């Protein structure tokens, strides 16, 4: 499994498909726009979903037959017959010409040996509404990580975290509920279209943002379209827009981030699409 992908899948259905196809390796796949496919392993399949070609991050991705604008991308979810995998890993370890990579070595070899099958994600995805494409996000970049988090602030997000039939299990420490304090003009703790996690205390304004656990937003501050990781503290009179703040950072009083592209690029890391990443090391490097 890939550790930087977000999706809901019933693995039992993919496992059953693997057994039914009778191949040594099964790779989950999903249709993506051809332009986006350059960042993934891309495959070609026959009518029985046997993989006939596999290329890792191609400059010119092959298209899905009949769909010239789309490609079949690997989701980084593999099922192997155990003995086959152990034998292949030992063989690969002894190969001085191998890069020792699943996408570049193990999977392409399985394809050449006619031992690789594809599993369409639509057969095992969970929680997809009729007419809706299966939800799958690769969050391996700052932009995609920000996008996936901010998506959750929608009134009816594509990924439903409130689905009791298929909950997303994760470790959550025992923390007090989130708290919103003060009710004075210009000093009113509130959050609109936002996700606020346990242990957080809000006395400023939060709009369309995701706050992880134990975040503190002090009075007179405004947080918009931002993702704040655990134990972040936002001082007074701070303004944040389209920012990702790493765990444990303290933003000093009066700091403005996300409103001046040139200043942000000098102090922090700013992506081409305008998302600013702030880490403790970046803050420590700022002049006194």
Please give the residue ranges for each predicted region.
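Gly/Ser/Thr-rich beta-alpha loop segments that engage phosphate groups in nucleotides
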Residues: 5, 78, 142
